[in-house]
Every structure is written in structure tokens, then in C-alpha cells.
Amino acid sequence: MVFPFIMPYEALAINILIFGLFAMGFNLLFGYMGLLSFGHAAFLGIGSYLTGIGIVHYSLPWGTAILVGVIGAAIGGLIMGFLAIRTRGIYFSMVTLALGQIVFYGFYKAESLTGGENGLRGVRVDSFNILGIPVDFLNPLVKYYIILFFVVIAIWLISRILNSPLGAVMEAIRENEKRAAACGFDVTRTKLLVFVLSAAICGLAGSLRALHLSIVPIDSLHYLQSGQAVMMSILGGMGTFFGPFVGAAVMLYLEDVVTTFTRHWMAVIGLVFMFFVLFFPKGIWGTILSKLNMNQDTK
């Protein structure tokens, strides 16, 4: 739909789709449950690596490889969540960080499968058929729309989750965990379920990234990726539906522009982030929603 307007920046547009989805998956746990995880890079990396391994080492069809990546990330989320949700506050964050680093080290050492520090190369998807119609994945237009399709489906699923009874329970737990438990809600089970759903969505983002890059860099699992998800969510507006996506778009666009002028782009991004935290604590999208609501109230 919008592809003609973003040429020749299709790589940036695809990255925004992928990391926007990653941030939205993270925000499901952080923004809607109030649980700050520093280990979500593990799920981005698990999705990327399992999809890549499936294609490179086992010649799986790309659709099956994506499914393997998502399921693998969900299983990883189940294990990490089971261990982490028994803690609270900063302890929860530190446990997820430690577990994420264990996952990083595990994939780093499995060189025969993952390529170690060089990453996994050769994750190529050249062409395939959909309903008998040949599709060239190397065509940027085709790649953009295929990734957009998966992202739209995932966003729809997130919307369904938030508008379901589970979404109401999530909000109740975020606002007052003890009161939610007193009302009869299974807080621990809900936390674990949301953790798994969040991990699966982040795993899908990782799978799509592997197909987009045709390689899986080891930094997919690095804790800095988790930090990016935190920054994108806060920058756009944590606890808002599209906020993390907006944050991802702004952050990646700034990175793309600033890197052409200076190698110290991270410092510039940091200053922008501090500015919004200090003066727009609700984030970009959150501030826009607040202004719109105020305008409606005055009418």
C-alpha cells in the first residue's frame, strides 16, 4: 500500500515493521502487565536462529521454518517465564537478564549450528509458489508486502488478546496485583501465559528478520536488543497499543539519518530519549492520544 512512498528506503521500512512488532510483543508484557524484562532479546534471537537453522541445515520450507521459530520462542518464554515470574520488581528484571545471557552463550557456543560469533549465513529464500503463483522474495516489493502481511496478522492477534477477558485480567493485575488475586484471578498463571505470548510475538519478529537479512547475526541475542525494546516502548508510549511501533519508527529513522552525519549516533538517540522522558513522559503516541482525548472532552 505505502511501498511506492518509501522507495528507496525499503530496507528501513522493513526494519521498522520487524522491530515495531518486536516492541509491541515486548510491550504486551511491559506496558500491559507492568513486568520489565531485560531478556526479550533471547526470543528475538531464538526465532531468528531456529528459522535460519531450519532453512540452512534442514532445508525446511520458509513457512515451516517461521513456525519452528515462533514455537521455539514460545517454549523459551515458557521456561524463562516459569523461572522469572516467581520474583518481582528489579529481581524479575535481573533474572530475565541473566537467563537471556545464558541463551546468548548457548547459541554462541553451538558453532556447528549457529556459526558462533560470525552468525548463521545462507538463510536464503529466493522464490516460491503461493497457490501456484511464482513469488520472488528477493524483490524488495514482494519482501515488504509478505513481511507486512505477517506483521498485520500479529497486530490483529495482539488486539484480540487485549480486547478479550484476558486483557481485562492483565489490566487488573497491572493496576493492583493483590486486589486481582483477592478477586479470584490466577495471577501467576496469567503472568506466565502473557510471558509466553509476548515471547512468541518477539520470536515471529526474529524469524522475519532472519528472512529479511538472509543471515542471523549473533547480536540478535545481545541484551542491547532488549534495551532497544525498552526504549522503543517508552519513546512511543508504553501501555498504548501503537506506541511501541511509533517508538520503533522514530528511533530507527533517527538512527538512519544521524549515522550519515556522525558516528556518535547513540549519544544523539540518548539525548532524544531523555528529552521525551523528561518532557513527554507518556511517549509520542501516548501524548497524542492524551491531546485528542482532551480536545474531545472540551467539545
Please report, for each region that a protein language model flagged, where it lies by residue.
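Alpha-helical transmembrane segments within multi-pass membrane transporters and channels
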Residues: Y58-Q101, V246-G247
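Cytosolic-side transmembrane-helix boundaries in multi-pass membrane proteins
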Residues: G119, E175-K178, A182-T190, V258-K299
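Hydrophobic alpha-helical transmembrane segments
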Residues: L12-A13, L17, A42, G63-I71, ...
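Extracellular/periplasmic helix-loop junction at the C-terminal end of a transmembrane helix
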Residues: L99-D136, G167, T262, W285-T287
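Helix-loop-helix "hairpin" substructures at the membrane interface of multi-pass membrane proteins
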Residues: L138-P217
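Residue-level recognition of pore/gate-forming positions within transmembrane alpha-helices
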Residues: F19, S48-Y49, V70-A74, L97-I102, ...
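Single transmembrane alpha-helix segments in multi-pass membrane proteins
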Residues: M7-Y58, F82-T96, A172, E177-A182, ...
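Transmembrane alpha-helical segments in multi-pass inner-membrane proteins
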Residues: L67, K191-F279
